Amino acid sequence: MTQKLYYIDSHMKTFTATVTACAQNGDRYEIILDRTAFFPEGGGQLGDSGYIGSVRVFDTHERGDEIIHYVNRPVEPGSEVNCIIDWDVRFRRMQNHSGEHIVSGLVHKKYGYNNVGFHMGSDVVTIDFDGELSAEQLAEIEREANLVVAENRKVKTFFPSAQELKNLEYRSKKEIDGQVRIVEIEDTDICACCAPHVLSTAEVGTVRILSSERRRRGGEGVRITMLCGLDAYDNEVVISRNNTEISMLLSAKRNETAAAVQRLLSENEKLKARSASLCRAFALMKAEEVVPTQGNICLFDDILDEASLRLLVNETVKKCEGVAAVFSGSDETGFKYIIGSRNIDLRKAAKAINAGISGRGGGSPEMIQGSCTSCTENIKDFLIAFSF
C-alpha cells in the first residue's frame, strides 16, 4: 500500500521514497513507490507529472491501494530515489479545483443547484449545473467568489468517521464506496473530494467566469467555463494585450473598445450594402452591353461579388441560345465560374465542361458553378466553341 503524502501536505514539492516495484507495460514502465506525493488522476483533476530521480514521470493513476507512476525507462526496485513534482502544473490545478469548489458551493447555497459535471482541461475548466443561471447571476457569483478569495478563508481536508459523515451535510456528485474525504472551505462549501487543494482561499488568487451556455446533454441547466489563479492571470494578460492593440488600431480608449468596434461594424455594414448596390448596377450595365448571339457567351470579371456574378449570368442567358459563363480570378490563382443556360441541361453537361476547362463543380440543370485551373485563352476558346 502506497503512503499518500499528498494528503499529509498538498504543497509537498519534493520527497524521497523507495521503489517497491517496476514493471514494463508496452512501451512504458510502471513504478510503485512506498510513499508518494504524486497525486493520481481523480476527482476531476489530472494525475501529476515530474521526476523519480532522473526518470520522467508523465502520468499517475491509482490501482487498488497502490499509486502507479508511468515512466519511460525502468528504475531498480529497492532503490531510494529523490522525487520532484511538476509544481507549477500541480499548483495551477489546485487553484482551479479549489476555485471550482468555491463557485459550486456559492451556486448551491444561493440557488440550490448541484454541480453535475466537472472537467479540468488543459486550457479551461467547465462546470455543469442542473439549473439555469443568467449572465447577471453569474456575474454576482463571480464577485462573491472573489470576495471569498480576498477574505483568505481556511481550506480544511479531513476523513470523517462513518457516524460523523452521517450527520454531515456535504456536496457529492456520486455515491462513494469506502472512506470519504471531505474538503471544507470556511463558510463557503463542504464537498467530498479526493484531490489535493490549496490551504486557504487566498491561494486561489482570482476567479474568472469566462462564458456560459446551455447544457447539451443530461437535461436542463447551464455549463460555465472558468479559470482561476495563474491560469486566469495568463488569460487576462492575453486579453489585455489584445484590447490594447484594438484600442490603438481604432484610436479608442481601452475601456471603450467595444463601442468603437460596434461603430466599425455598423459602418462596415453600410459600406457592404453600398458595394452590393454598386455591384448590382455594374452587373446590369455589363449585361446590357452584351451582344445577343445564337451561340455561347464567355465573360471575365474581377470586380463583382458572387451575388452580382449570378445576376450577370441570369441576365446574360437571355441573350444567347447556348451557355452564358462568367469567370472570376486569374491565370495565376485559377478561376471560379458560374455558368447558366435556358436550353441546355447543365447538370448533364457539367462533366464535359469541367473536362474542357480543367474544372470541378456542378449544380442544377439551369446553373452550375465551380472552379477551374485552365488559362483565360483556353477557357475562351473552349466555351465559345462548346456545344452539347
Model-predicted regions and their roles:
Residues 1-388:
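A glycine- and charged-residue-rich anion-binding loop/surface
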